Amino acid sequence: MANNDQKRDEGYIEKLVQVNRVAKTVKGGRIFTFTALTVVGDGKGRVGFGRGKSREVPAAIQKAMEAARRNMIQVDLKGTTLQYATKAAHGASKVYMQPASEGTGIIAGGAMRAVLEVAGVQNVLAKCYGSTNPVNVVHATFKGLKAMQSPESIAAKRGKTVEEIF
């Protein structure tokens, strides 16, 4: 499992979460292909993930990075942490994320850490339950981040002020 960090011209932070070799058995032997899982973010709340497949590792990574840039979402952050504690699941992977005080850092494992870092979250407590398959953990983390809304956006949808909601 690789964990690469790159900055590009566009201001995006790119992280390689996983490279996996897959073998297809055919009459003449085995055909090896590679799959790559990457996350891309601007460090200010925009984050995306992508998967790419190819016969060569660099091509798979490139395809995954392009897919991640096309699949970006906006996360409503509260400073450098999350708005509130949230849970999400994808397949057998379940994730729990909660805001943390300033100076805590990112307390999260593996694939979850990569997503939170590129999203711009700097203080968070997170835990992964069930399956730790990186693909499912990234999906679950995205579901949790995507479902999170700021009090301002909830107030606007209801046609009320933030004070009326609390």
From Swiss-Prot:
InterPro entries tied to this protein: Ribosomal_Su5_D2-typ_SF, Ribosomal_uS5, Ribosomal_uS5_bac-type, Ribosomal_uS5_C, Ribosomal_uS5_N, Ribosomal_uS5_N_CS, Ribsml_uS5_D2-typ_fold_subgr
Domain comment, as recorded: The N-terminal domain interacts with the head of the 30S subunit; the C-terminal domain interacts with the body and contacts protein S4. The interaction surface between S4 and S5 is involved in control of translational fidelity.
Annotated Gene Ontology cellular component terms: small ribosomal subunit
Organism: Pseudomonas entomophila (strain L48)
Molecular function as annotated in GO: rRNA binding; structural constituent of ribosome
Keywords: Ribonucleoprotein, Ribosomal protein, RNA-binding, rRNA-binding
Gene Ontology biological-process entries: translation
Protein's UniProt name: Small ribosomal subunit protein uS5
Family membership: Belongs to the universal ribosomal protein uS5 family.
Subunit structure as annotated in this protein's UniProt entry: Part of the 30S ribosomal subunit. Contacts proteins S4 and S8.
Cited function: With S4 and S12 plays an important role in translational accuracy.
Alphabetical list of Pfam families matching this protein: Ribosomal_S5 (PF00333), Ribosomal_S5_C (PF03719)
Domain S5 DRBM per the UniProt entry, residue ranges: 12-75
UniProt key word Ribosomal protein: yes
